[in-house]
Structures are given as C-alpha cells and as structure tokens.
C-alpha cells in the first residue's frame, strides 16, 4: 500500500505543538486509536489536523474541505493508496471534470463524498498517456479511425488537416480533459459511492499479512492470538509447509511501535505468545503503560519486547504527566502543596527544574505519560536480572 501524505494531528483544546503527532497516511485503525491516545483525546471533534506534505495526489490539496473528519480523510487516502499510475491519472482527470461541472452549475466546493466517489470510479475512464494537447488528440482520433467522416480523404490531404481544431471539437463534445500525465475521458456513467460501513471493533491484538516466497498470488491474513489449528490453516492457504516458506508483507499491532519490529516469520510462535500477553495487558489496564515503556526504553528486537513485558512491574508510569509543565506542577504540589506551590510556580525556571527532576528520577516523558525505572536506574539500560524480585514500586514525588 502506497503512502499518500504526512499529516499532523493535534488536540484542538491545546496550543502545545509538542503534544501533536505526525502520521503517514493512510493509517490502520489501531494507529489512529494510538494517535488519539497520544494527544489525550477521544472525540474526533476535538482533533485538529493538517496535511504537511503530499507524496502523491498533490492536486487534492485545494479541495480538502475544512469540515472533513480525520476518519473520512483516512478512508480517502486508503482508496487512493491502492491506485496504480493509470488510475492516478484518471483520478486527476475526473477531479478536473468535477471542478468544471461545479463551476458551470455554481455548486460550491467539492465535497468529501465526491472525492471518494471519484476515487471509486477511476476504472470508468480512458487514459491516453501520450496525448497532451488538442493537436495530439486530433491526430489520435484521425489516425485510429475514430473520425469516419474523414476516412474517404486521400492520404495527401491528411497533412492539411487542422488537428488542433479537430481535437478541440472532440474534447469538448465528450467533456474530456488534459492532465500533466495524459488525456482523460469518461467511458461510463459514474457510480454512486457505496453505503458507508462503520468500523467494527477490533478483536485481534496483531494482524499479520503473509505471502508465499515463490508465489505472490498465495496470500493470507492471520489474526493473533490464534490457535494452532488456525495457524496450520494459514500455512495451507499459503502453500507453505514451513513458516520460512512465507514472509510478512504487513503488520498491524495494537502497539504500533511493534509494526516495525515484527519482521521475521520464523518468530511467529513467539509473536503469537506476545499477542496473548498483549490481550492480558489490555484486560488489566496495563497496555498504555507498556506502550510508554516500549517507547522510552529503546526496544529494537523481539527479545527486548519480551524483556519489557517480563519486567513491566519494575517500571513506574504516570499517565497524567505528559509534559514538563505537568511535571513541575505535580512535583511542587508533592513537596510544598497549596499556595506555596502556586507562588513558587509563578517565579520558577520551569524548564531547568523539570530537566533536573527528570534527571533525578532517571525518567523520560512520552506521549502516553512519564516513565522511569523503579530503582531509578538508567532507562536505556536493561534492568538486571537480580533486581526483578523488587515487586513494589517506590513512590516518587508525584
């Protein structure tokens, strides 16, 4: 699936740019849910978003309606990401035709639903990649026998034809349009957008898309955790007697950080075990803490992930402390409390104080909250095995 654009996502209830998230669209449902968690909001109406950069389909920029929700835009980019080069040209042509229609009928801006409808109709067009002008179009129609009224002309007369005029007449009669990548004309009526299907609640912890090494047509989707029977069924679908006969082509985990770590198909039994652990963390309300610990401790391998799972009780996590200002307020309230805390807060070098507090606790701020080791050791170093028995988390000044 192609990446379409970079999107900045933030909470409209705060002006703190550091609390925003950069995402490459389209994103999975889990990635979207994770982004909402990072910006500390659940309601789509509380979200501010903007496209920072288009990798393709740049011509859509002037037509992004301010009322478009982030979910609608993600659905649109998901449609666009599946288009090939010819279909992308068709999309640009269809959009230009729709803009022309709106201008003629004074219908106002293009709507989100129209953009999605156009993207679903790209196969209802003909694209002439080598035709870029009225003259090119005229020659194409004459030389390919589409102007039967000119077939009787002797060969010597063709050089005298005004191909630009012929092309202009044909383009206007069939309502075609030129794009930077060729001429586009509709061959069928556009079909309306299918009824919207609301997103269903996700039951899997990790979804893997797999493909046979030697046969790209053999693909399968495996939702984890899975039974041994289901895993054997997927092997049959892939025609892969052993897991090393297949490869991952996609990963969607409830902890998006894992998407880039789960790459080796021979780790599949351990990944299934990981999915079971994630399910247990979700049920116990510890999933956000695990996300924060994974992000703060530089997990780079599957072994690192299992280490953090095993030693999760040895980390402290404060979900309400997501920035330095919250850290300073919390620390002052713990140390002084009341009016004294408010007074000192007004006159304090908060940036320097926050840095010192983080250093003292060996802590790090993550989009999910603050993390530190229970023994106040360096976060970027593994917790030694002999310290695992310390099950009680010491209380910090928060």
Task: For every predicted segment, state its role.
Residues 1-31, 200-228, 393-398:
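Short, extreme N-terminal segment that most often corresponds to the first beta-strand
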Residues 10-12, 72, 139, 164, ...:
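Residue-level signal for functionally critical sites in structured catalytic/ligand-binding pockets
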Residues 24, 162, 349, 372-373:
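Helix N-cap / beta->alpha transition motif
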Residues 31, 165, 229-230, 352:
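An acidic, carboxylate-rich microenvironment
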Residues 36-157, 183-205, 216-217, 223-342, ...:
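Mixed-charge (acidic/basic) macromolecular-recognition segments
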Residues 148-176, 335-363:
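Conserved, folded interaction/cargo-binding domains in eukaryotic regulatory proteins
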Residues 162, 349, 383-398:
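Non-Sec secretion/translocation targeting segments of pathogen effectors
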Residues 168-199, 355-388:
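Long, highly charged low-complexity segments enriched in Glu/Asp and Lys/Arg with interspersed Ser/Thr
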